[in-house]
Every structure is written in structure tokens, then in C-alpha cells.
From Swiss-Prot:
Widely expressed. The gene is Ccdc50. Involved in EGFR signaling. Residues 218-239, 247-263 have a biased composition (Basic and acidic residues). The modification Phosphoserine is found at S5. This is Coiled-coil domain-containing protein 50. The modification N-acetylalanine is found at A2.
């Protein structure tokens, strides 16, 4: 086998070979560092996107729950208001019926009183027609006197006693009318007191229901706020964020050391990836409703008065 001869004059020097080897090694190291940086960048982007998607889902879920709670609360307020309106309308109808009944009763009483008065007048006229007029003692003679010798005739005594009986009957009728009116006033006052107590009871029930609704809504808001804070302060999320920050810091230091090296050719160009900034969403909760106290019952009551 023939020996291969090597021209020693064309061989490069040791320094040139070392320099070329150093350049090749630098290229290889730069390429590996760049690949590591790209992989780290992709991993951080994926993790960021996952966090953003998770935050979006949580925010959307909380917003839907808040909207549902508001809709339910508004529905309950409307139902309570409608119930108050129905109660007020019922009370107003009862007051109207009571006033109409009282008016009819008063009219009947007036008619009865008028009939009684006409009857009394007719009886008085009839008594006057049937009662003879006496002129002294000439009708019965001069000897028609009392046993005690008085001058008072018997016919005049009967004429005086008849108006006394009529006035006594009128007094009884007047007393009965006053007693009836007093009894009606007492019944009316009792009915008014019962109605006022019912209205006050309805107002108290409405106030208690409204207070319970406010407490329930406040508890729901506090529960949502605590769950959101717990998700924000989750230790697993903190550990993931710290590891991502340390990896990015190591990549930045390696890249800085690569740039600081002198007299090295630029690394091969690579396609860069654009960073996607995470979008933060804030969940704005609506404020609580101040429903005024339902005054429909009071309005109906005062309108009637």
C-alpha cells in the first residue's frame, strides 16, 4: 500500500486551526443557546396563554353568577312590590265597600227616622182631631168639680196628659237614635283600628323581607369576593410565576454573555416569535339596590281618609 504524502507547506498553522475551532465552537454554543431561548420563550407563552384562558373562564363564570343573582333579586323585588300593590288595592276596595255600606245604612236610618217622624205627626194630628176643646165647666154643668172643691175640669186634665205622653215617646226615640249613632261610631273606630293594625303588620313584614334580601345579597357578594381573592393568592400559581421568572432571568444572562464576547461573527438568523401580552380582565360588580319602602298600603289608606 502506497503512503499518502502530505504537503506540509499547505497545512495551516496551529493558531489558525485553533481560531477556526474556536469560531466553530462559538457558533455551536450560540446555536444551542438560541434554541434553548426559543424553547423557553415558547413554554412561557404557552403558560401565559393558559393562565389568560383560565382567568377568562373564571371572570366569565363570576360575571354570569353575578348577573343571575341580580336577576333573582330584581325578580323578588318585583314580586314583593306586586304583592304590596295587591294588598293596597284589596284594602282600598274594602274601604270603598265599607263606605258604601255605611252610606246605605245612613240613608236607611234617615228614611226610618223620616217615616217615624211622619207617623208621629199623623198620630199627633189624629189625637188633636179626636180631643174635644173644653171651655170651662159649662159643658158638664156648674156642679161638675172635684171632690176637694177645686176648679180644674176633667177634660182639661186629659188634654194635658196626652202631650206629656207624646213628648215622652219622642224622648225615647231620640235616646234610641243617639245610642245607635254611638254604637256605629264605636264599631267604625274599632274597624279603623283593626285596619291600621293590619297595614302596620304588612309594612313590618315587607321591611323584614327586604332586610333579609339585602343580607342574602351582601353574603353572596362577600362569598364571590373571597373566592376571587383565594384564586388570586393561590400558592401554585405563585410557584409557577416564580419558576417562569427565574428561567427568563437565566436566559437573559446567557444572552448578555453571548453579546459581550468580542470578534465573533453574528449567529445565524432565526425567526422570532412575537410575545402575546396577557389581557387582564376586571370583574366589575354592580352596586346594591335601595328599594324604597313600599308605601302603597299607606297611600291607599290615606287616600281613603
Amino acid at each position: 500500500m502506497a503512503d499518502v504524502s502530505v504537503d506540509q507547506s499547505k497545512l495551516p498553522g496551529v493558531k489558525e486551526v485553533c481560531r477556526d475551532f474556536a469560531v466553530l465552537e462559538d457558533h455551536t454554543l450560540a446555536h444551542s443557546l438560541q434554541e434553548q431561548e426559543i424553547e423557553h420563550h415558547l413554554a412561557s407563552n404557552i403558560q401565559r396563554n393558559r393562565l389568560v384562558q383560565h382567568d377568562l373562564q373564571v371572570a366569565k363564570q363570576l360575571q354570569e353568577e353575578d348577573l343571575k343573582a341580580q336577576a333573582q333579586l330584581q325578580k323578588r323585588y318585583k314580586a314583593l312590590e306586586q304583592h304590596d300593590c295587591e294588598i293596597a288595592q284589596e284594602i282600598q276596595e274594602k274601604l270603598t265597600i265599607e263606605a258604601e255600606r255605611r252610606r246605605i245604612q245612613e240613608k236607611k236610618d234617615e228614611d226610618i227616622a223620616r217615616l217615624l217622624q211622619e207617623k208621629e205627626l199623623q198620630e199627633e194630628k189624629r189625637r188633636k182631631k179626636h180631643t174635644p176643646e173644653f171651655s170651662g165647666g159649662s159643658v158638664f154643668g156648674d156642679n161638675y168639680y172635684h171632690e176637694d172643691g177645686g176648679m180644674k175640669p176633667r177634660g182639661i186634665k186629659e188634654a194635658v196628659s196626652t202631650p206629656a205622653r207624646a213628648s215622652h215617646r219622642d224622648q225615647e226615640w231620640y235616646d234610641a237614635e243617639i245610642a245607635r249613632k254611638l254604637q256605629e261610631e264605636e264599631l267604625l273606630a274599632t274597624h279603623v283600628d283593626m285596619r291600621a293594625a293590619q297595614v302596620a303588620q304588612d309594612e313590618e313584614i315587607a321591611r323584614l323581607l327586604m332586610a333579609e334580601e339585602k343580607k342574602a345579597y351582601k353574603k353572596a357578594k362577600e362569598r364571590e369576593k373571597s373566592s376571587l381573592d383565594k384564586r388570586k393568592h393561590d400558592p401554585e400559581c405563585k410557584l409557577k410565576a416564580k419558576s417562569a421568572h427565574s428561567k427568563s432571568k437565566e436566559g437573559d444572562e446567557a444572552h448578555r454573555s453571548k453579546i459581550d464576547r468580542p470578534s465573533r461573527p453574528p449567529p445565524p438568523t432565526m425567526m422570532g416569535l412575537e410575545d402575546t401580552d396577557p389581557t387582564h380582565f376586571t370583574n366589575q360588580h354592580s352596586t346594591t339596590w335601595h328599594l324604597p319602602k313600599s308605601e302603597s298600603s299607606q297611600k291607599g289608606f290615606h287616600n281613603k281618609q
